[in-house]
Amino acid sequence: MSRAPRTARAELPKGEQARHVPVLLAEVLAALSLDRPGLAVDGTFGAGGYTRALLEAGPEVRVIAIDRDPTAIRGGADLVTASGGRLRLVQGRFGDLDTLIADQDEAQADWIVLDIGVSSMQIDEAQRGFSFRQDGPLDMRMGGEGPSAADLVNGEEETTLADILYHFGEERRSRAVARAIVEARRRAPIETTAQLADLVAGVVRPEPGSPIHPATRSFQGLRIAVNDELGELVRGLHAAERVLKPGGRLAVVTFHSLEDRIVKQFFSARSGRAAQASRHVPGVERPAPKSFKLVTKGPVLPSEAETDVNPRSRSAKLRAGERTDAPAPPPLSAIEMLASLPAPQGRGPRR
């Protein structure tokens, strides 16, 4: 594990809001090593911070930027105009990036960056329903399609809700929270973020001195389930593996342990290291051809200077790898299992 030098982020624009500051930007650019003409793919466009930096890396760098959120795509129109034809914005999921770039008549990419999870823009907009700090409709959908968080909260069985909160939110009181949700929805639907946050806070007591809101883990679990975030990450890693040229590089920024575990196991297995065991994986998979070599030997963490400017960067971790000329192996089932809820095996210990 390495932390970026304190001086590495001194140039961060203090006048901008944190939502416009891409996390670990200097470290991502160093890991990608954009030293030649080529195609870069930003799989998570958001506010365009990484895309802008990719364009500025060199006049012969072309960029395809992907986002499932139509609001983000609309917000990037000016950047497309300013790019002089070097930027294409594509609405879609980065788990389909191989298909999406093929639709743009591109077969392979030289660099890919993935910034995993919800964007600051989505969190800060109350109407998107991601945050317990602002009251809004209980939505949480990144792309606006599919069941919302309210649909899950008001429609799923108690055991399924408990599993979502426990495995995706790492909420130790998951069964108690799920029970409280079911009891509350019998009286009236749970429709707003404030309703849910207050409900969870009545069950989960904050740890003394901790700044973490009691509803943090429950909101994380629901958001991951609504958007299939871990499944999307797994598909994105495999898609990147298929389209990167030999010598091409993949940089992935994660923000919590569930994401980082998947990325770590992917690079570990694909670089020839032994896959890591987990509670979901009964055994270790047979070694596959080495399709990546590690660029970062462990997670790269933000510097103190960056966390001073952007407190949301504190939990960020960067891992990166360089594609070899080995053919892409079949998808790694160990990380696919990490991305889904385990099959029911009895009630187990009380949570």
Curated annotation (Swiss-Prot):
Residues 274-351 are annotated as: Disordered. Its EC number is 2.1.1.199. This is Ribosomal RNA small subunit methyltransferase H. Belongs to the methyltransferase superfamily. RsmH family. HAMAP family: 16SrRNA_methyltr_H. Specifically methylates the N4 position of cytidine in position 1402 (C1402) of 16S rRNA. The lineage of its organism: Bacteria, Pseudomonadati, Pseudomonadota, Alphaproteobacteria, Hyphomicrobiales. GO terms for molecular function: rRNA (cytosine-N4-)-methyltransferase activity. The keyword RNA-binding does not apply. Disulfide bonds: none annotated. Keywords: Cytoplasm, Methyltransferase, rRNA processing, S-adenosyl-L-methionine, Transferase. It is found in: Cytoplasm. GO terms for biological process: rRNA base methylation. One of its GO terms (cellular component) is cytoplasm.
